[in-house]
């Protein structure tokens, strides 16, 4: 086995020691945040998530998330499949996207909805306003999306390290410098739209 440490080759008799800091699991608390509930029954709750709200706690966003609001609204009645940081969450939408999100209240519903998303029997459509005038009335964008090569906070088309991202679009209306479109996603990559 040929290895390097800090660009220097290691010797066959060398020992490599890894010191990993303990992972810190932040405390996630219920918060009384108003929810725009589109539908609710004993298995699922469908929320119209507003722009600016993060779906689940993550680095830099441990409060004010949809999960914090759901914990307050639903109490213990959320699927535990995705753990304490994502109770009930089957899919996500970006922080700056407004749209419907299905949340599962039990593991049976979670497995059922996850399978439907995987099999594409649930259709996800979004409306978006794009800068520029799109010439074709409809089309498909099939480009891999991954981290931007120089700005890790951004996503970009990344042929080398990106994951498959397929978006079908249909032009609804054209304006002088913008196009209003409907998008149907086959995949669900961060910042895909």
What is the predicted function of each stretch?
Residues 176-184:
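Short histidine-centered loop motifs in beta-beta connectors
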Residues 36, 144, 168-170, 182:
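Short, surface-exposed charged micro-motifs
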Residues 1-6:
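Short, exposed "boundary/linker" segments that immediately precede the start
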Residues 113, 190-193:
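Short beta-strand segments enriched for Tyr within beta-sheet-rich domains
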Residues 7, 11-149:
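RNA pseudouridine synthases
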Residues 41, 95-96, 122, 163, ...:
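Short flexible coil/turn linkers enriched for glycine and charged/polar residues
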Residues 56-57, 104, 155-157, 181:
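Thr-Gly-centered strand-to-loop micro-motif
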Residues 27-32, 158-167:
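Short coil-to-beta-strand transition motifs
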